[in-house]
Amino acid sequence: MKEKFRVKKHQEFQEIINSKNFEKNSFYAIYFRSNNYSYSRIGISASKKLGNAVKRVKIRRQVRAMLCELWGLDIPLDLVIIVRNGYKIENYNESLNRLKELLDKILRRITNE
């Protein structure tokens, strides 16, 4: 995922989270808002409760790989994906299915508005 497709600044994370549009399950909480670009921007956050830095980086890489499989970047949205304590590093397919469910819910909400 290229740099321009990422949300990096703390202030941008806070603005997206404060928009209070979100979907969540036991693995993820995804906050979203529309943006003025022709593409999506994605930020991933993994809390220190999930483990040491090595584990958190691995989790972020896995989530980025899942998003490359599932999400088309042509939708003008900003997403902040917060990985929750229920996430399991070993069970990639279950994590992928849970993420797909949430992204489908978000797409349905956007198309209904």
Give residue ranges: language-model regions:
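Positively charged, solvent-exposed patches that mediate nucleic-acid binding
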Residues: 1-113
